[in-house]
From Swiss-Prot:
Component of the ubiquinol-cytochrome c reductase complex (complex III or cytochrome b-c1 complex) that is part of the mitochondrial respiratory chain. The b-c1 complex mediates electron transfer from ubiquinol to cytochrome c. Contributes to the generation of a proton gradient across the mitochondrial membrane that is then used for ATP synthesis. It is a multi-pass membrane protein. The gene is MT-CYB. The chain crosses the membrane at residues 33-53, 77-98, 113-133, 178-198, 226-246, 288-308, 320-340, 347-367. It comes from Rucervus duvaucelii. Keywords: Electron transport, Heme, Iron, Membrane, Metal-binding, Mitochondrion, Mitochondrion inner membrane, Respiratory chain, Transmembrane, Transmembrane helix, Transport, Ubiquinone. This is Cytochrome b. Gene3D superfamilies: Cytochrome Bc1 Complex, Chain C (1.20.810.10). It comes from the Eukaryota. Binds 2 heme b groups non-covalently. It is found in: Mitochondrion inner membrane. One of its GO terms (biological process) is mitochondrial electron transport, ubiquinol to cytochrome c. A ubiquinone binds at residue 201. Belongs to the cytochrome b family. Signal peptide: none annotated.
Length: 379
């Protein structure tokens, strides 16, 4: 008798995606982050659902409802902190996943890569609107500052901002619609992730060497299911260490002060995972220029397949490109640090230099280095 998992219409889809999927035999732990992102998304949707049962999206009661969740709801505190720190784990996995794609040349799967970039934008949008919901000082002023950037768009900017606000300032209408967006976007992310997987399974996974692995494939289960379970256990370990021992480590103390439109916090800054982009935004003294640089810092990922001049796919056998890649990582860490610093000397100039270096490495140095490596190998 043929196995039901291979014949049943629904189970067949699951089987082809997670059980009998032919996978390269040599993929490393860097390939774990896809499944970890899936777990993060499921965790965020579940904890978010339980939070939404007790949250009220009204300017008068939003802050109190979050306090009520932490104090009065059974295990509300752990659900709230799992959701807040779960977002941080989500972004750590995202950055690792994108970094893996850049290092091993996975961006040559064009459809998979482009949907991945759209996913990155969608997750960033979700995290931004979510940060506004507790209605603390940083929530309010973060929403005001970031939405205000749209006013830099010529001609339609001001109308666009007022349309998003639902009035002439960030107020009740803004909070209500941000809650609606924050509820719907994760489901859009889940749908996009399925399309992402669909396109990936059309080509099969890349591997560290960047060489086609059709000649050496192994079934996904049990080899990579076991490997993924180990990754998931480690992810949950790190998440729970954060939640139970240092729940506010990555948050901002200003967000424990209720939103007050009459009092601006001394340093307005987003959550840590947006600091690199925020530093690039601040490093340009012109409003429209800053907004363009901010968007370009992520959109530049779409250009990666066009900027690939090497005759090898992966960086595994390209030491000069490897050095450049790690300089880029160091530069992004520098930008993250600068984004959290006040706008004064020497942070301004460091931020400007790091921003220039970021674009210079990706647009100029990486393609040139790849060409030099080709010539050294007499290709």
């Amino acid at each position: 008798m043929i196995n039901i998992r291979k014949t049943h219409p629904l189970m067949k889809i699951v089987n082809n995606a997670f059980i009998d999927l032919p996978a390269p035999s040599n993929i490393s732990s860097w390939w774990n982050f896809g499944s970890l992102l899936g777990i993060c998304l499921i965790l965020q949707i579940l904890t978010g659902l339980f939070l939404a049962m007790h949250y009220t999206s009204d300017t008068m009661t939003a802050f109190s409802s979050v306090t009520h969740i932490c104090r009065d709801v059974n295990y509300g505190w752990i659900i709230r902190y799992m959701h807040a720190n779960g977002a941080s784990m989500f972004f750590i996995c995202l950055f690792m996943h994108v970094g893996r794609g850049l290092y091993y040349g996975s961006y040559t799967f064009l459809e998979t890569w482009n949907i991945g970039v759209i996913l990155l934008f969608t997750v960033m949008a979700t995290a931004f609107v979510g940060y506004v919901l507790p209605w603390g000082q940083m929530s309010f002023w973060g929403a005001t500052v970031i939405t205000n950037l749209l006013s830099a768009i010529p001609y339609i900017g001001t109308n666009l901002v007022e349309w998003i606000w639902g009035g002439f300032s960030v107020d009740k209408a803004t909070l209500t619609r941000f809650f609606a967006f924050h509820f719907i976007l994760p489901f859009i992310i889940a749908a996009l992730a399925m399309v992402h997987l669909l396109f990936l399974h059309e080509t099969g996974s890349n591997n560290p060497t960047g060489i086609p692995s059709d000649a050496d494939k192994i079934p996904f289960h049990p080899y990579y299911t076991i490997k993924d379970i180990l990754g998931i256990l480690l992810l949950i370990l790190f998440l729970m260490l954060l939640v139970l021992f240092a729940p506010d480590l990555l948050g901002d103390p200003d967000n424990y002060t209720p939103a007050n439109p009459l009092n601006t916090p001394p340093h307005i800054k987003p959550e840590w995972y947006f600091l690199f982009a925020y530093a690039i935004l601040r490093s340009i003294p012109n409003k429209l220029g800053g907004v363009l640089a901010l968007v370009s810092s992520i959109l530049i990922l779409i250009l990666m397949p066009l900027l690939h001049t090497s005759k090898q796919r992966s960086m595994m056998f390209r030491p000069f490109s490897q050095c450049l890649f790690w300089v880029l990582v160091a530069d992004l860490l520098t930008l993250t640090w600068i984004g959290g610093q006040p706008v004064e000397y020497p942070f301004i100039i460091i931020g400007q230099l790091a921003s220039i270096l970021y674009f210079f490495i990706i647009l100029v140095l990486m393609p040139i280095t790849s060409t030099i490596e080709n010539n050294l190998l007499k290709w």
